[in-house]
UniProtKB/Swiss-Prot annotation:
InterPro entries for the chain: Xdiol_dOase_suB (IPR004183)
Chain's gene name: amnA
Function: Component of the 2-aminophenol 1,6-dioxygenase complex that catalyzes the ring fission of 2-aminophenol to produce 2-aminomuconic 6-semialdehyde. AmnA seems to have a role in the stability of the complex.
GO biological process, one term: catabolic process
Organism: Pseudomonas sp
Alphabetized UniProt keyword annotations: Aromatic hydrocarbons catabolism
Signal peptide boundaries: none
The protein's name: 2-aminophenol 1,6-dioxygenase alpha subunit
Quaternary state and interactors: Heterotetramer of 2 alpha and 2 beta subunits.
Pfam annotation, one family: LigB
Length: 271
């Protein structure tokens, strides 16, 4: 396994569309900072899983060499556009597809002009400055029928496949923490995690990540998803666990805060 860096980042577009909101801008700055750390680790490819790329029938991988378009987020469309220009390592993506099939996982590629790239993938690529011609990505979808364990297995499969090619890998899980949001308009300057119990759950999980106590972390994860209404069952973190073979030494939380009531964090893992 040749993973050189690993990160958890939020997929919300708010920090990037509304950096005038100080608390949201802090997420943007933190993501720019970890992007520098990612690139300093000198990966050959960046392996991305975003909870916002939904798949149902199969496990879908992005197999278009260059995806160039303008995206408008389905929730925050009033705040502007997200242009993107994303380069993928098609050979590695196709190798992952073949590895999935060999393991009994139905998989196929997406290679279409104007294919709808999800907000989370776009945000991660733009903020961290990856998905370039010099640093391409391999992007996996979030199959809605996969649970946390299946997501860990998928990540492990992808890492093994790419490592066999002798590539250095940076891995990213894109998604938030607690899932409750404000359901009425708020002053963004007064944003906070909407439920105190979810705020406490988020802080506990982040503290366990920092400690590197995987056993205690896994035990806490059993209840975290329900108690915090975690985004997509926190599968993006399980993606990281699977990619890292269930082990990391600790973590640095570069920023934690609220995004319209939900919790989110920018986390760098020590591997």
């Amino acid at each position: 396994m040749t993973i050189v860096s690993a990160f958890l980042v939020p997929g919300s577009p708010l920090p990037h569309l509304r950096p005038d909101v100080k608390s949201w801008e802090s997420f943007k700055v933190a993501m720019q900072n970890v992007g520098e750390k990612l690139r300093a680790s000198k990966p050959d490819v960046v392996l991305i899983y975003s909870t916002q790329w939904f798949a149902v029938l199969d496990e879908i991988w992005l197999t278009r060499q260059r995806s160039l378009d303008i995206h408008v987020d389905e929730n925050w469309h009033e705040f502007g556009e997200l242009p993107y220009d994303i380069y993928s390592d098609v050979d590695l993506a196709n190798a992952c597809i073949e590895s999935c099939r060999a393991a009994g996982v139905n998989a196929r590629g997406a290679d279409y002009e104007s294919f709808p790239i999800d907000t989370g993938t776009i945000v991660a690529c733009n903020a961290l400055k990856v998905g370039t011609s010099d640093l391409p990505v391999v992007v996996a979808s979030n199959n809605l029928y996969d649970d946390q364990a299946a997501t860990e297995r998928l990540a492990a499969l992808a890492v093994a496949c790419i490592s066999e090619k002798g590539k250095r890998i940076a891995v990213i899980g894109v998604g938030g923490l607690s899932g409750s949001v404000f359901t009425t308009a708020i002053d963004p300057a007064e944003d906070r995690v909407v439920k105190a119990v979810e705020d406490d759950c988020n802080k506990n999980i982040l503290s366990l990540m920092e400690s590197g106590n995987i056993q205690a972390l896994r035990e806490a994860l059993k209840s975290y998803s329900k108690e915090a209404r975690a985004e997509m069952g926190f599968k993006h973190f399980h993606w990281l666990l699977g990619a890292l073979d269930g082990h990391f030494k600790g973590a640095t939380v570069h920023h934690y805060g609220a995004l319209y009531g939900s919790g989110a964090a920018v986390v760098e893992f020590s591997i």
